[in-house]
């Protein structure tokens, strides 16, 4: 992908470099936690740069999540250029990039955030939710020391929790409202009907993708959010953060879950299944 530099603007610790003509915008960020100020007015987050910086501040200041000292945001103008960007900027295999571009509008990777900003997409609440969700993935990967190590359902569910919390801080939504919507949304989910969540499959990236393509993207993400929300309510947000940090020391998803939360994945699956069956009645 060719890139033409058209400008450079210093925003605090952030340098914005725009590339146009290729449908690709590149925004390098440098994060100094001491200089971050968490915004409270969503009306100030009108550009890609302002949104990423403001939401990063909420993650760091309000939620205590670490962000890498530097990372790059890639913004693409449509599905085809997004697919090419996944291959050339994020080193995703062409087959996987083609699959992801069919449904994903954002991807968080190791010190990278890739966004499909289709021309018809409004930059409102859901746009901010998307960015916050993917920034949470960037933070998780930084803590774990690599991609795809932690339980995928927990990575997705925690990212939704973080995104909804960010929207709440901005006065755009509440976690309680999203919890209620998710509870209603999973009432007829296949996993609940079958009384089998199958966290072993939901725990790896490929399995999670297969499940949400088969069972529906929205209810699968709602299920992941409710499971993560249950774990956060039970054990605390800091414990979940510690779980992701544990992968920097040991790459054993089952042992890390057991040592962090005091039970096996199978035991948690039965516990959270019982909880979900109760709340959806």
Named regions from a protein language model:
Residues 4, 75-77, 83, 255, ...:
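Compositionally biased, intrinsically disordered low-complexity regions enriched in proline and serine
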Residues 12-15:
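Hydrophobic alpha-helical membrane segments, chiefly transmembrane helices and signal peptide h-regions
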Residues 17-19:
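C-terminal motif of bacterial Sec signal peptides marking the signal peptidase cleavage site
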Residues 21-23:
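Bacterial signal peptide processing site
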Residues 25-151, 253:
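Juxtacatalytic substrate-recognition/specificity segment
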Residues 105, 146-281:
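Acidic/His/Gly-enriched intrinsically disordered linker/tail segments
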